Amino acid sequence: MERLRYYIAQFLSYTLHPGIMPTAGTIFIISTLPEVFTWDFVIRITSVVFLGTYVGPLVGILILRISGVISSVHLIKREERIYPYLIGAASMIATGNHLERAGVPVEITLSVYLSGMVVVLSTILLPFFKSSAHAAGVSAFYALYICLHQRYGGGEIQYLVLGAMVLGGLSWARLELKRHTLNELLSGALLGFVPMFLLLSK
């Protein structure tokens, strides 16, 4: 049973990786907005977000690992998160700038910028404790879902309940793997949810 719990926790951690949340958010935004978009536009914008918010930071982490700056790509040690976080934030902000100049829907641009801002805030807090990036990513997506539901009627109420259950499941997974404390999960959730909700709920 203990081994099964471990595998379930690992599955949830990889499936709900914070790096894929901006891409998932972009797909949800495009599907919710009242405008009609061509498949070419959808693929192009989604690809840009994926490359800038997942592939770019991942390549940075791999380079840091190969060069010996960090000891693991899992960034378990708090002090080893600083450089990867800075690289990730820079990549996300640059992606947001590119999207803004390309004239994509403002919700996509803001969500990518906010992702970068959350990473910056997490970096600032690192000397004190490591906030959960997983909790921040899922909470930011949850806030995005609520805001788009309020603004455009996108999504269903029951999925809000499901989203809360997913966040609870992720929190259990990170605790089960002993990657975070409850306080680190809570701080990550607040870092992800509050900025996204405050900006997009207007």
Question: Language-model segments: which ranges?
Answer:
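Membrane-interface helix-boundary motifs at transmembrane edges
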Residues: 37-40, 67-79, 101-106, 179-183
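Loop-to-helix transition at the N-terminal end of transmembrane alpha-helices
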Residues: 39-55, 77-79, 186-189
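The first (N-terminal) embedded transmembrane alpha-helix
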Residues: 12-33
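Membrane-embedded catalytic cores of phosphoryl/pyrophosphoryl-handling enzymes
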Residues: 108-202
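Transmembrane alpha-helical segments of multi-pass membrane transport proteins and ion-pumping complexes
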Residues: 18, 22-23, 53-65, 89-93, ...
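Short, Lys/Arg-rich, polar N-terminal cytosolic tail immediately upstream
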Residues: 1-9
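Juxtamembrane helix-capping/reentrant segments at transmembrane boundaries
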Residues: 12, 72-87
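C-terminal halves and exits of single transmembrane alpha-helices
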Residues: 85-104, 126-131
